[in-house]
């Protein structure tokens, strides 16, 4: 498997999410490089980093969805939980001495791109709207400022 290449159709239009997704792609590519060098310690480090970063990315993404009132946020969170379980199983197998590199890279690349194009695409409008409302609210002085103007002129 060659390095994964970011494609424009993976962009959600939410810069912070796109940057996090690109970072995950970089980590998958680091896994490939470590595996090519047959560096067990480097592979272990990349797997741990991937799991940790993905967990924090999912938590961030889930918070954005919940804050936006995205109606399928609970189902989306379940998808994340199932994925983390699968990746954790690979981590355990690797720690037990099994060579799971190719299998894990295949899962990660297929799952990530499919997830972004299908599952993540579903929340984009709600989150972008929510974020624009926050920016608008802030530019208008926020709730307190508007309330003070309304009550005290």
From Swiss-Prot:
UniProt keyword annotations, A-Z: Iron, Metal-binding, Oxygen transport, Transport
Binding site for Fe cation 1: 21, 57, 61, 120
InterPro entries associated with the record: Bacteriohemerythrin-like, Haemerythrin_Fe_BS, Hemerythrin, Hemerythrin-like, Hemerythrin-like_sf, Hemerythrin_metal-bd
PROSITE patterns: HEMERYTHRINS
Entry-linked Pfam families: Hemerythrin (PF01814)
Top-rank taxon, per record: Bacteria
One function term, GO molecular function aspect: oxygen carrier activity
Disulfide bridge positions per record: none
Protein residues bound to Fe cation 2: 61, 76, 80, 115, 120
UniProt keyword Iron, yes or no: yes
HAMAP family: Hemerythrin
Oligomer and partners: Monomer.
Entry function: Oxygen-binding protein. May be involved in a storage mechanism or for delivery to oxygen-requiring enzymes. The oxygen-binding site contains two iron atoms.
Family: Belongs to the hemerythrin family.
The protein's name in its UniProt record: Bacteriohemerythrin
